[in-house]
Amino acid sequence: MMEPSGTDRNLIVCMKQVPDLSIGRREKTEQPPQRLPVRLNLLDAYALEAAARLRDADKNIHITALSLGRSGEDEALRQALAIAADDAVLAVVPDPDVLDALAVSRLLAQAIRLIEKKAGPAELIFCGQQSIDGQSAQVGPQLAQCLNLPFAGRGLEASLCGGVMRIRQGNEDGTGLVEMDLPCVAAFDKIPGEPRLPTVRSSMEASRAVIPMLELSEIPAPLLTVRETRPASRGMQGVRICKQTGEDSAKQLFQLLNAAGVL
């Protein structure tokens, strides 16, 4: 782990390594979760992009990517390094698949405290609103509770004004603006614009990077059991109606809807 300079503002992005469901759909196989191809959780990638945009405006921001996983399970962290992270840390747990949201939050809080002992206090802690596998949206607020920090969720945009973090967040009426004193925790949804892509050079550097591992002292007892994963059923495929007249098209549409039990 790099030693940030004394002027750096430390920002930690918590991210999860999740099954690559697109590959699972193509293979159409049932596999135990540890054998599935993996990728960086999409909303965590948006949290990383929000962090990178803050660094674009303030070069003193130092981004550390943090993930829980088995020893050597660092693919998501290498993706983060290739995209925007300055360094990365893997907090080692024997079996992350059996941890519920509260256990994950407690372990992340433990890891963050260990990082702070070496690199100094973290002013900002970002994460995705939820993961594509768990979808509980509980880790962000529970992590803030474990660290006794203010929290804002469903973030769409982040900006800094002195010692205050401003989060534009989505809500039922559109968007709202939340201000929090630093340090704080924020969870991000799909933010406007697409996340930046890694370059060939950054990907090569990330593939060679040495990612330090943290040994956590307090591992909660397993609470979940994942027996298998399977691709979702694809359902009925789209149909193109190419009749000469509108009347013939309407007749075919009626027949298709009737056969599908819609009518």
Where are these regions (language model features)?
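Electrostatically charged, flexible surface regions
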Residues: 3-4, 153-263
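Short, glycine-rich nucleotide/cofactor-binding loops
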Residues: 14-16, 33-45
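Short Gly/Thr/Asp-enriched flexible loops that form oxyanion-binding sites at enzyme active sites
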Residues: 134-147
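N-terminal nucleotide-binding beta1-loop-alpha1 segment
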Residues: 7-26
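A short, N-terminal amphipathic alpha-helix
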Residues: 43-60
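Glycine-rich phosphate-binding loop signature in dinucleotide/nucleotide-binding domains
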Residues: 112-122
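A glycine-rich helix N-cap at a beta->alpha junction
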Residues: 74-111, 187
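Residues at the starts of beta-strands that form the adenosine-phosphate
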Residues: 10, 60-64, 87
